[in-house]
Regions:
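ABC transporter nucleotide-binding domain
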Residues: 45-79, 113
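Phenylalanine-focused residue identity feature
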Residues: 15-17, 57, 61, 67-68, ...
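ABC ATPase nucleotide-binding domains
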Residues: 1-60
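Non-catalytic connector elements of ABC transporters
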Residues: 65, 74-191
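A composition-driven signal for long, intrinsically disordered, charge-rich low-complexity tracts
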Residues: 3, 8-11, 65-68, 180, ...
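A sequence-level detector of short, solvent-exposed, charge-rich linear segments
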Residues: 8, 15, 19, 23, ...
């Protein structure tokens, strides 16, 4: 894929590449059009589509995303505060969303943007607690589910395996705290 992209750039021609493989699309593209039922939902760069999708559909279509229902408490040009039942109050910076106080919204966080902590971090912004669910070791990373008290569906968390270990890192029902950066959150209107 990387060689094909280099060849395209050296020759300087335009490629139109149709694929269902998201990794291929993200690797080979300068711009991606996400379509649904024959209609273009969004056109943007791979980074823009992944990090700042413009709709819940695109956010869910490109990669994995955890969605939490919320309501806007405050909104300025530089920050948004959202109240959610599952996560509590969420602070968001670097948001492209133009939201109004009282508006229903989705708080969307990618699984790799949620960092697990296995000892109580104390009072910390953008932190919630839960219990470990099932996990899967995938070689370079592990996926696991966290059950939150105020949410029926578990939250998917992706953790990079930075150390060489084949031991199970996480035990079911173990307490865990999830933390995320304020600029790792995407806020989307909930219609």
């Amino acid at each position: 894929q990387i060689e094909l992209r280099q060849l395209q750039q050296q020759i300087g021609i335009t490629f139109l590449f149709v694929t269902h493989d998201q990794e291929e699309a993200l690797t080979l593209s300068d711009r991606i059009a996400v379509m649904s039922e024959g209609a273009v939902m969004e056109i943007a760069s791979p980074g823009q589509l992944y990090e700042s999708p413009g709709s819940p559909f695109v956010a869910d279509f490109i990669g994995s995303m955890n969605f939490f229902e919320g309501e806007i408490l405050s909104s300025t040009d530089s920050a948004i505060t959202v109240e959610t039942s599952a996560l509590g109050t969420v602070s968001v910076t670097n948001s492209d969303a133009k939201m109004t106080v009282g508006q229903k919204a989705w708080v969307a966080i990618r699984p790799e943007k949620m960092q697990p902590v296995f000892a109580d971090p104390g009072e910390h912004a953008n932190t919630t607690s839960g219990t470990m669910g099932p996990s899967a070791y995938l070689g370079d990373r592990s996926h696991f589910y966290v059950h939150l008290p105020q949410r029926e569906d578990p939250v998917l968390v992706a953790l990079q395996n930075l150390e060489r270990s084949i031991a199970q890192l996480h035990k079911p029902n173990q307490p865990v705290w999830l933390q995320w950066a304020s600029d790792a959150v995407v806020v989307l209107p909930r219609d």
